[in-house]
Amino acid sequence: MEICYVQEVASSLVREFLSRKGLKKTSLTLEEELPRAPRSISTRNELRAALHLDRLYKENKLTEKPLKTLLEIMTKYFLEHSGKTKALNMRGEQNPAPPKGLATNLQQRHAGDLMMAVCDVSDDETGESSAVSDTSKTEIYRSQNDLQFNKSNHLKGPDRKQKQTEAGVTSTGVCSEGELMPPRVNIREHQERESWEMALGAKSSRSETQRPRSSRMVRGMMSGPTASSQEDSLKKRGPRRSAAANTPNPIKGEVLSEITGGMGEPSTIAPANTALKLGKEFAAKLLSTSENLRNVSLCSTNAVPKPNAFAAAETAADGKGATEASPYASNEHRRRSGFSNMDLNSASLAKKTLPFHRERNDKEDLKLDDVEDCLVTEEIRNIPTALPGNLKQIEGKPIDLAQAVEIKKILFGSSFCCFSDEWKIQSFTFNNNQPLRYGFIQKKGGPCGVLAAVQGCVLKNLLFGKDADLRVLQPSDSQRTSCLCKAIADILWRAGDNKEAVVALSCGRPQFSPAGRYKADGILESLILYKIRKYEDLMGFVQQHISQFELGPFGCTLLTLSVVLSRSVELVQKDFDVSTNCLIGAHSYCTQELVNLILSGRAVSNVFNDVVELDSGNGNITLLRGVAHRTDIGFLSLFEHYNVCQVGSYLKTPRFPIWVICSESHFSVLFCVRRELMSDWKMERRFDLYYYDGLANQQDEIRLTVDTAATYIEEQENDLTPPLEHCIRTKWKGAVIDWNGTEPIL
């Protein structure tokens, strides 16, 4: 289990909580202080699948008052399975009546006292990092009338007091080594309740004289009033650490036997063992997450380790650090001891509770975050020092008024124009219709040229990439998101002449005050520009912020701005045949220049090959710029059928059998799943092409069979020939096209 993966899943869980609760300011602060890691989980469905919460999610939906967030669902599940079914319900009631045996001890305390329950929860015990203060890692439970039980009351002698100091347990339930964090033990059986009563009866006199230890602050949580001052707290922290260093491996069974007053009956230890087993069960589920999500990732591993194998590997890796004198040595010993005691029954129970979903495998290379200096352990020190390059932090530069004016002029021809609503609501959102999961959904007309060009690049990675899954057209969420990341990175890198790229992201806050001849549109003013000079860094950065492109709301606009800035406004203007051209034309339609910029990296105005010189007759020569090289994604146009233009071979015969189709002022995609179509002439005799149009509300797959061996005879009186067929015949002259039962698109 990689700690960085657990931390990233946890941070994604927090982001989902903040988003569902509508805490926008907190979310923005979190994004600034804890940026998303590469390949971060950005969708709720993917996060739910990663945590195996599908069953719990469905059960929650059936309740009278369903919980809104996954974090609440997990919390409810864990509390219910830690013996708190009666303590917590959907309405959030948290104050159950205490057991009879403990009520007697509780009544002896002053009514005004505020009791603090402090359970030490270290990274070693939970398997993940917690956001805690610099002086302590504790989980604080504040209660006035809840069940209170002081573990220190049942420890006798100096050695036992030393163990009590190390464990850091002062009240409420048992918190023995290896447990996740069960704060209280809920005694269900009558025999167990009697055992606890006997234990309390024997130690009740010492319970009144025992002074609670000072509480420790958890970041973001206010502590209640305590009897000891802050200075007193600092004095007590020192002995705690020294005791932890000098007392290796306290034994769980021994501590439990002391708590129960020396009674060795199994029934008295059963509640703690049950809580321990449930804690391990939940930890095993978290441990199994990254092991279940490996196949699609760029970083693959060999096999899923069993709990005992995991413990053995950790022990071997920590062998060197165990010999060093450190205040954390005891914690490390407890961690290894806790994992070594984990049996296969816990793992199998976890699998039965939350089944695997192996068809959606995805392991993320994520960012290690929120590790305090005073909390560094051998587990953190053993992380390889060679971190992936995509974890590099990239400094952004806010856009200024002058840049915004230049961009608007190159986009619209005027700084008074703005992005239309069709552009503002459009992102690269995938279709969840099962036969068309690879395709984008277009909400309204306008940015169809950008969508079709990016769609072609996504299909290239999906069908012919290194991790192509046998040309399957029904990718998982993680697969299609990964293909979108690579498509965006390739487009921007190509526009930057394979030397650099600029990624424009929205921060949600204006970076300058509009003035003069400039009209604000709410998008350009909030941009942060990130210049990246390595492709690996670009890929990691796009993966880290893919949610802005995929979920939006300005995904399509941000990509357009990024590709223009990657090419630079000056070079885009030089690519035009006429300097007054623009990238977005009338009615917010994409121009040919914008489509060419995405496909070839140059905003040329024509689709023929290379450059054509026109002699105006007076010795003046006009240069018309076309596509300079063979592209990855091709282009076919209905205008060629009407003899308005001539598409060159660079676009007609691309490296991959994917074409952007321009027909009736609309852009869509045509592709073949067999790459041999571009290299084997025998393949061109009869082959299948697939057509996708994100705007047409397409529900089913459209497969066309093209037969070039037969001859198509056009009927002069028939005006109902589908425009798509005309586009196809600009490349395969006279081919017969069969729609295979699908109604032709007219």
Swiss-Prot record:
Positions of the catalytic residues: 448 (nucleophile), 666 (proton acceptor)
Protein name: Probable ubiquitin carboxyl-terminal hydrolase MINDY-4
GO biological process, any: proteolysis
Source organism per UniProt: Xenopus tropicalis
Catalytic EC class: hydrolase
MF annotations from Gene Ontology: cysteine-type deubiquitinase activity; K48-linked deubiquitinase activity
Function text: Probable hydrolase that can remove 'Lys-48'-linked conjugated ubiquitin from proteins.
Similarity section: Belongs to the MINDY deubiquitinase family. FAM188 subfamily.
Catalytic activity: Thiol-dependent hydrolysis of ester, thioester, amide, peptide and isopeptide bonds formed by the C-terminal Gly of ubiquitin (a 76-residue protein attached to proteins as an intracellular targeting signal)
Classification of source organism: Eukaryota, Metazoa, Chordata, Craniata, Vertebrata
Keywords: Hydrolase, Protease, Thiol protease, Ubl conjugation pathway
